[in-house]
């Protein structure tokens, strides 16, 4: 009896017809892929992309040179040199470098920062041709912060209830 059932299934190509119906069912559904670089998918507010240093609205950099981000970085990708204390008792960084080749994008630096100075922004398109271009200095980080400030502030506001 089993061989008869197997012969009928083979004769009528049951698996083949089933596969055709399955293909047709998925053929008319909405596409699961997008045409990247021309189309970009949604990015979560918690996305950890290219690093940026933020400024206060008056233009002063936020980083207070506490070096918590440097201490917590598991990859030791952050290097900070603090300048001398200013008259008001605060200090700022003279050097703030991130070696993106070493960075593992864990987000610990962002979590450790008491003033939200260092953040991981929304940009994920920063491919380079040389390794030297992946060594971000303070000026590049500040430029990233200026470029992405509106989106970074929006993402931090959306994430605030969970922090």
UniProtKB/Swiss-Prot annotation:
Q: Mitochondrion: is it a keyword of this entry?
A: no
What are its cofactors? [4Fe-4S] cluster
GO biological-process terms attached to the record: aerobic respiration
Q: What's the short name of a Pfam family annotated to this entry?
A: Fer4_7
E.C. number(s) listed in UniProt: 7.1.1.-
EC top class, as a word? translocase
The keyword NAD is annotated on this UniProt entry: yes
Q: Where in the cell is it found?
A: Cell inner membrane
Q: Where does [4Fe-4S] cluster 1 bind?
A: 63, 66, 69, 113
For membrane topology, the record states: Peripheral membrane protein
Q: Gene3D superfamilies, per this entry?
A: 3.30.70.3270
Family listed: Belongs to the complex I 23 kDa subunit family.
PANTHER family, A to Z:
NADH DEHYDROGENASE [UBIQUINONE] IRON-SULFUR PROTEIN 8, MITOCHONDRIAL, NADH DEHYDROGENASE UBIQUINONE IRON-SULFUR PROTEIN 8, MITOCHONDRIAL
Q: What does this protein do?
A: NDH-1 shuttles electrons from NADH, via FMN and iron-sulfur (Fe-S) centers, to quinones in the respiratory chain. The immediate electron acceptor for the enzyme in this species is believed to be ubiquinone. Couples the redox reaction to proton translocation (for every two electrons transferred, four hydrogen ions are translocated across the cytoplasmic membrane), and thus conserves the redox energy in a proton gradient.
Quaternary context: NDH-1 is composed of 14 different subunits. Subunits NuoA, H, J, K, L, M, N constitute the membrane sector of the complex.
Quote the protein name from its UniProt record.
NADH-quinone oxidoreductase subunit I
């Amino acid at each position: 009896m089993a061989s008869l059932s197997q012969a009928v299934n083979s004769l009528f190509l049951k698996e083949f017809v089933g596969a055709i119906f399955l293909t047709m069912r998925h053929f008319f559904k909405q596409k699961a892929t997008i045409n990247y670089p021309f189309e970009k998918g949604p990015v979560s507010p918690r996305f950890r992309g290219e690093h940026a240093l933020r400024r206060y609205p008056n233009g002063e950099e936020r980083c207070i040179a506490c070096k918590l981000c440097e201490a917590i970085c598991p990859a030791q990708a952050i290097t900070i040199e603090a300048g001398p204390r200013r008259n008001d008792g605060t200090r700022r960084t003279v050097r703030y470098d991130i070696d993106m080749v070493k960075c593992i994008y864990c987000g610990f630096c962002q979590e450790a920062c008491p003033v939200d100075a260092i953040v991981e922004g929304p940009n994920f398109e920063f491919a380079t041709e040389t390794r030297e271009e992946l060594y971000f200095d303070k000026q590049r980080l500040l430029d990233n912060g200026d470029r992405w400030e509106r989106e970074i502030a929006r993402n931090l506001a959306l994430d605030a209830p969970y922090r």
